[in-house]
Structures are given as structure tokens and as C-alpha cells.
């Protein structure tokens, strides 16, 4: 695992980045740190090898950054809405099925007609509530 994380200059100067909350920036940086970058050909062209396979769980983020679960959820919503990440697989936390994420470039077109809007799919399952402790 590398000690280096690549962030494009355009990203932090973009209108989409300026709308991020502090918690969303922390979560975005954690996603970017989990990318596996590989060089393609002789040119300086890099691609994300594990795009769509990046896992970041509620348990990890709350332990590492002491961010509340609701804050993490709101950060995911904001990162998807502004075009920084996409959800490749919606996991079901109770079944130990983790969500998988991909780094997106949609943020480049944020505020333009070409911007593709996405949002996190809401969980409408009627899951039973955990039994209360008496």
C-alpha cells in the first residue's frame, strides 16, 4: 500500500468541492486513499484499478474519524449528489453485505447542463427493528 494519494488540482478548485462539508471532505479523502492507481502505457495516464470495488463501512468510518453514522450517510449522499463518488453496489449492513463505491468524474460538470445527476437509492425494505433492551 502506498503512502501517496493523488488529488487533481481541478478537484479542490471546483464549484462542487466548495459545496462539500468538512465531514464530506474527510470521507472523500478516505475514498481517494483507498484507490489503487495503475499506470497505463508509457504516458502519464493513470486509472483506478479497483473502481467500483472500494469498500468503506460505517463501522470503519465511525471508529477512525469518530463521525456519527448519520453524518457518514449524509456525506455519502452529498458526495454522490455532487459527482465525486458513485455507488456500484448497495449493501445490506445487517447481512454483512458491504456497499461498494467507485470514484466518479461527474464533479467536473457540476453546475453545467452536461452534469449527470445521481442520488443514493433509499432503503425501503421493511426490516424488523432490533429488540429493545429491558
Give residue spans per PLM region.
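Short recognition helix of helix-turn-helix/winged-helix DNA-binding domains
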Residues: 1-58
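Residue-level marker of intrinsically disordered, low-complexity segments enriched
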Residues: 2-5, 9, 65, 85, ...
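A broad, structure-centric signal for solvent-exposed, well-ordered loop/edge residues
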Residues: 14, 18, 27, 63, ...
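A broadly tuned preference for mixed-charge, low-complexity surface segments
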Residues: 31-33, 79, 128-133
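Winged helix-turn-helix DNA-binding recognition segment
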Residues: 36-103
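Short, amphipathic alpha-helical interaction segments positioned at domain boundaries
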Residues: 105-134
Amino acid at each position: 500500500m502506498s503512502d501517496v494519494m493523488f488529488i487533481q488540482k481541478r478537484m479542490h478548485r471546483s464549484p462542487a468541492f466548495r459545496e462539500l462539508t468538512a465531514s464530506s471532505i474527510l470521507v472523500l479523502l478516505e475514498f481517494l486513499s483507498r484507490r489503487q492507481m495503475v499506470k497505463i502505457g508509457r504516458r502519464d495516464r493513470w486509472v483506478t484499478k479497483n473502481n467500483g470495488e472500494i469498500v468503506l463501512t460505517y463501522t470503519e468510518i465511525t471508529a477512525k474519524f469518530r463521525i456519527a453514522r448519520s453524518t457518514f450517510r449524509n456525506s455519502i449522499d452529498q458526495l454522490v449528489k455532487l459527482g465525486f463518488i458513485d455507488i456500484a453496489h448497495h449493501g445490506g449492513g445487517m447481512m454483512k453485505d458491504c456497499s461498494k463505491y467507485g470514484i466518479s468524474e461527474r464533479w467536473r460538470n457540476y453546475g453545467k447542463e452536461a452534469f449527470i445527476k445521481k442520488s443514493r437509492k433509499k432503503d425501503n425494505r421493511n426490516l424488523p427493528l432490533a429488540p429493545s433492551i429491558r
